UniProtKB/Swiss-Prot annotation:
Protein name in UniProt: Putative replication factor C small subunit R395
UniProt key word RNA-binding: no
Keyword Secreted included in the entry's annotation: no
Function: Part of the RFC clamp loader complex which loads the PCNA sliding clamp onto DNA.
Family indicated by similarity: Belongs to the activator 1 small subunits family. RfcS subfamily.
Binding residues for ATP: G45, S46, P47, G48, V49, G50, K51, T52
Length: 319
């Protein structure tokens, strides 16, 4: 195990076949690769599902050895990225390139862009789109203006499953010769909530700090409550046992976890807890309201106790 290269880069997919995507998306990408017309793309999905890696693999496949000259990547989340739109894109599109290949521009995190920026890009697509493929990645495609959506194919990436992430992490552990147990990897999957990038970063942090991967070490390095404690609180809420549920919550608070992380853990556990879908959604709504209050600076323990009371009250409505 060496610490010279971040694992998120070391284990980034190199080819399209390396990206974890479902068969339907894979077929659509293959159609895109074979399409002789200049088709533009919007790739949308949760963080860490491989959107940016997919675009880089597409560029490598289409451009080959010309990738350094024919591929431009702009991250809209950076101020530099927004300023690059008017100063870098037109010159890039105008420069002479291989006659049989289209240049490719990736606009990463495009849903962060203002409408004005997006309209500017739409005008550039109209002007340069015959010889340049524009590809957008975003978490929420509804924040991309209709003018751009109407001229793009939209690929919707699903959130990665725990099993998919677990398999990928186990391969990394074997390659890096890191001792691990299944509980440790499952805990990383739980914390990452479908985000491969976060899961690999958490794996590397734990491995470099402790040189092995176990549940307790992962929880320690990631500073999140034990999901079993959260599960116990939810179980006690289902039994209307406020006193015991609050006691466990107090024990969690004493371990100095961030209130925001405590509440977020409830959402992770509720998503997989065995209950009716209707009740699950109502309880998650209560937890989300508590998250909003905490994000506004209302961080007293009363917020957490109040949340437990509201969860119990909501559960009792079904009795």
């Amino acid at each position: 195990m060496t610490n010279s290269i971040p694992w998120i880069e070391k284990y980034r997919p190199v080819n399209i076949d390396d990206v974890i995507i479902d068969d339907n998306i894979s077929k659509q990408i293959n159609i895109f690769l074979q399409d002789r017309e200049n088709v533009h793309l919007i790739i949308t999905g949760s963080p860490g599902v491989g959107k940016t890696s997919t675009v880089r693999c597409i560029a490598k496949e289409l451009l080959g050895e010309d990738m350094s000259q024919g591929y431009l990547e702009i991250n809209a989340a950076e101020d530099r990225g927004v300023r690059s739109i008017s100063t870098i894109i037109p010159p890039f599109c105008k420069k002479v390139f291989a006659a049989n290949k289209s240049k490719i521009i990736l606009l990463d995190e495009a849903d962060i862009m203002t409408s004005k920026c997006q309209y500017d890009i739409n005008n550039m697509i109209k002007k340069f789109g015959r010889k340049t493929k524009f590809i957008f990645t975003c978490n929420d495609s509804s924040k991309i203006i209709e003018d751009i959506q109407s001229i793009c194919r939209i690929l919707r990436f699903k959130k990665l499953t725990d099993e998919q992430i677990n398999q990928y992490l186990s391969k990394i552990c074997v390659n890096e010769k890191i001792p691990y147990d299944e509980q440790g990897l499952r805990t990383i999957c739980y914390i990452s909530n479908g985000d491969m990038r976060k899961s690999i970063n958490d794996l590397q942090k734990t491995a470099f700090t402790f040189e092995k991967i176990t549940k307790n070490l992962v929880l320690k390095i990631c500073k999140v409550p034990d999901p079993e404690d959260i599960r116990k609180i939810i179980s006690l809420c289902l039994e209307s046992n406020l006193e015991k549920a609050d006691e466990i919550m107090n024990n969690i608070i004493k371990l100095d976890y961030c209130y925001f992380d405590i509440v977020t853990s409830f959402i992770y556990v509720l998503k997989v807890y065995d209950m009716s879908e209707n009740l699950r959604l109502r309880l998650i709504m209560i937890v989300n309201e508590t998250k909003i209050n905490i994000s506004k600076g209302l961080r007293s323990k009363l917020q957490l106790t109040g949340m437990i009371c509201r969860l119990i009250k909501e559960i009792q409505r079904d009795e």
